[in-house]
């Protein structure tokens, strides 16, 4: 755990300030949770440092004896975590284009819109197909995406399982500033193969510290899958 925390700390950057600066292209990034890197959902703020997260994303931190802020790693009092009402108001005020159809939607409704957008669903249909990691005599289904191995989005190194991808990116691309598509997320039913993470390494360390393939029912939505996998992975530790 100590090693994981040190890797997370080394990958973190300052949380960008909320506001409309930067136009539509940067609006989602300014209102993105530093843990899941998606638009805030039921945002909460830590009283001591002021950093904001989705309520669900911060929950695991609140269940440990001495919680640390996931962004700055400073200790905080879990009783002094409150709803970020000012952020919620801004989410309802600002609009940004959908990644699929480019329709402008308020940030508060962006997640719901993306889950039903036909253009996004078309993009999801083009995700990588399943390839067995070893030769097999069994027939290979044609409609199962590859969720076993991934290619590095920075250098193209292939056939990396999830743990190998995390290790490879931490060791080889720690300082790479490029925005890239998460190959793990894009292989999921809810993934967007065209969405580039503003801080991929931070996303990788926070969002993919356990295997979806081990814990997830792929028929449920992304947030339910993440919470179920996180709970099950913690119960095995």
Swiss-Prot record:
Zn(2+) binds at residues 98, 101, 113, 117. It catalyses: S-ubiquitinyl-[E2 ubiquitin-conjugating enzyme]-L-cysteine + [acceptor protein]-L-lysine = [E2 ubiquitin-conjugating enzyme]-L-cysteine + N(6)-ubiquitinyl-[acceptor protein]-L-lysine. PROSITE patterns: ZF_C2HC_RNF, ZF_RING_1, ZF_RING_2. GO terms for biological process: autophagy; innate immune response; protein polyubiquitination; ubiquitin-dependent protein catabolic process. One of its GO terms (molecular function) is ubiquitin protein ligase activity. Gene3D superfamilies: Zinc/RING finger domain, C3HC4 (zinc finger). This is E3 ubiquitin-protein ligase RNF166. It comes from Rattus norvegicus (Rat). The gene is Rnf166.
């Amino acid at each position: 755990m100590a090693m994981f925390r040190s890797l997370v700390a080394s990958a973190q950057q300052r949380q960008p300030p909320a506001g409309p600066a930067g136009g539509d292209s940067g609006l989602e990034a300014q209102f993105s949770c530093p843990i899941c890197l998606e638009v805030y959902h039921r945002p909460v703020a830590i009283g001591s440092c002021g950093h904001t997260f989705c309520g669900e994303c911060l929950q695991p931190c609140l269940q440990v004896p001495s919680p640390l802020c996931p962004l700055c790693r400073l200790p905080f009092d879990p009783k002094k975590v409150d709803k970020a009402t000012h952020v919620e108001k801004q989410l309802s005020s600002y609009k940004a284009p959908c990644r699929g159809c480019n329709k402008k939607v308020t940030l508060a409704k962006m997640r719901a819109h993306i889950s039903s957008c036909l253009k996004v669903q078309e993009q999801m249909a083009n995700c990588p197909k399943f390839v067995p990691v070893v030769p097999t005599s069994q027939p290979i289904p044609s409609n199962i995406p590859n969720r076993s191995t991934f290619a590095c989005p920075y250098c193209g190194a292939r056939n990396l399982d999830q743990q190998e991808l995390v290790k490879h990116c931490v060791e080889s691309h720690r300082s790479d500033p490029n925005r890239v598509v998460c190959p793990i997320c894009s292989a999921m039913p809810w993934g967007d193969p065209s969405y580039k993470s503003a801080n991929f390494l931070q996303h990788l360390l926070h969002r993919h510290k356990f295997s979806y393939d081990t814990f997830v029912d792929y028929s449920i939505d992304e947030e339910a899958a993440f919470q179920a996998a996180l709970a099950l992975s913690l119960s095995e530790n």
